[in-house]
Amino acid sequence: MIYPSIRIEGAILSPDILGRLEDAHGQRPADFGLDGGGKVKDEIARAWADAQDYWRIFQRKLDTLRPETPATTETRNLWVIPLLGLFGYQIEFQAKGVELNGKTYPISHRATHRGRTPIHIIGYREAAGLDRKPERAPPRPTFGAPRMSAHALVQEYLNLHDELYGLVTNGRILRLLRDSSRLIKLSYLEFDLDRIFSDGLFADFAVLYRLLHVTRLPANPEAAAESLIERYHQDSLASGAR
């Protein structure tokens, strides 16, 4: 099956896992924390309905803002945090960046109950997007903060810290990144949220739910090797070597 909103760059996952994901390890109701005989498909359908509501509310809010506004607060509070909440995330704002090797990494949020996974959220209308350096300085610049793209910020942080996975998004695009300190080539899993919700791509949303539900992530950095997403990654590497 083709998933037009999903892009896999590098070796983070193999494309063939998308087609067999529903039958993969870790896809039973209990693996998502569902009790009482609930079905994963039913939970995904409910999350889809709620996510569409959040999307419409967010888009209406954008219509009221000045075009030059990056809409950072609105992107975080009206869209990304509620969306990830449907996937089981509890997210906490980070008032201070993390200092590593003399640099400060101003990651905006973390998942508070799942290994404190870094989640960096920028504005939907941020002109630089995820892959370019912002042209303007942040409103409250942090001494020692590296001036780089949102994607590069999270990637460099993961390469230097003990967390294995992180998320970066501007509300349009959502990416899962993995520590790639041993790799030169970019490696990430990307979901085009704009396309999913504008075109009504339920099948793509179901893959998003099954791959990025909070129960897929490491419970803590020490248990990263046992996490479902790392298992999928290692299985993908093994299948590629065969």
Where are these regions (language model features)?
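Short, basic/polar, glycine-containing "phosphate-handling" surface segments that engage DNA
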Residues: 1-67, 116-117, 121-242
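Active-site metal-binding core of divalent-cation-utilizing nuclease and nuclease-like domains
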Residues: 23-31, 39-40, 83, 87-117
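Acidic-basic catalytic patches of nuclease active cores, encompassing PD-(D/E)XK
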Residues: 65-95
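Residue-level signal for functionally critical sites in structured catalytic/ligand-binding pockets
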Residues: 72-76, 107-108, 120-123, 173
